[in-house]
């Protein structure tokens, strides 16, 4: 048997199997064991940014300016909540601002709202992804009193 014939046989088998496989023409069906087949709808508009719009009316006044951080240092579209929740350039700037301007329950309430907004956008646990140094600063601000 020729060497070229030996090489052609596996190729022919692989080609026949590929032809028999069903074509992929649609997104996979949702499955309980595959959370990546369903994402929440993302509105492509935002009055402030995708992160701030969801929580702005509920966040403490001391944090309202903080969520208006520019999204230009991120690869995210300004309206994409999920993306903004995981980019340290953005989350770190927001978190540091909140840590410097808010104290006590205001910090705790802000963190809960941020986590909730990010979870609703489909971000994985810990949802609002912030640098460790920012988390420490927020922890300190949450235990502090006064302004």
UniProtKB/Swiss-Prot annotation:
Its main location: secreted. Induction: Expression is induced during hyphal growth, by ketoconazole, and nitric oxide. Expression is also regulated by RIM101, TSA1, HAP43 and BCR1. Disulfide bonds join 62-102, 66-97, 76-83, 85-118. Keywords: Disulfide bond, Heme, Iron, Metal-binding, Secreted, Signal, Virulence. Heme binds at residue 80. One of its GO terms (cellular component) is extracellular region. Residues 34-145 form the CFEM domain. GO terms for molecular function: heme binding; metal ion binding. GO terms for biological process: heme transmembrane transport; intracellular iron ion homeostasis; single-species biofilm formation on inanimate substrate. Pfam families: CFEM (PF05730). SMART domains: CFEM. InterPro entries: Extracellular_membr_CFEM_dom. Disruption phenotype: Leads to defects in hemoglobin utilization as sole source of iron. Belongs to the RBT5 family. Secreted heme-binding protein involved in the utilization of iron from human hemoglobin during hyphal growth. May also play a role in non-hemoglobin iron utilization. Heme transfer occurs between PGA7, RBT5 and CSA2 supporting a model in which the 3 CFEM proteins cooperate in a heme-acquisition system and form a cross-cell wall heme-transfer cascade. The ability to acquire iron from host tissues is a major virulence factor of pathogenic microorganisms. The CFEM domain is involved in heme-binding and contains 8 cysteines and is found in proteins from several pathogenic fungi, including both human and plant pathogens. The CFEM domain adopts a novel helical-basket fold that consists of six alpha-helices, and is uniquely stabilized by four disulfide bonds formed by its 8 signature cysteines. This is Secreted hemophore CSA2. The gene is CSA2.
């Amino acid at each position: 048997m020729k060497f070229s014939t030996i090489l052609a046989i596996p190729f022919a088998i692989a080609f026949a199997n590929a032809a028999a496989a069903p074509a992929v023409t649609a997104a996979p069906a949702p499955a309980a064991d595959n959370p990546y087949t369903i994402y929440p709808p993302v509105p492509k508009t935002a009055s402030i940014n995708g992160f701030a719009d969801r929580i702005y009316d509920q966040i403490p006044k001391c944090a309202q300016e903080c969520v208006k951080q520019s999204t230009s240092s991120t690869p995210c579209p300004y309206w994409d909540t999920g993306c903004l929740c995981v980019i340290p350039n953005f989350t770190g700037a927001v978190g540091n601002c909140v840590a410097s301007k808010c104290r006590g329950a205001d910090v705790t309430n802000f963190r809960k709202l941020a986590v909730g907004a990010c979870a609703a956008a489909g971000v994985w646990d810990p949802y609002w992804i912030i640098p460790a140094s920012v988390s420490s600063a927020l922890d300190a601000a949450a235990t502090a009193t006064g302004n």
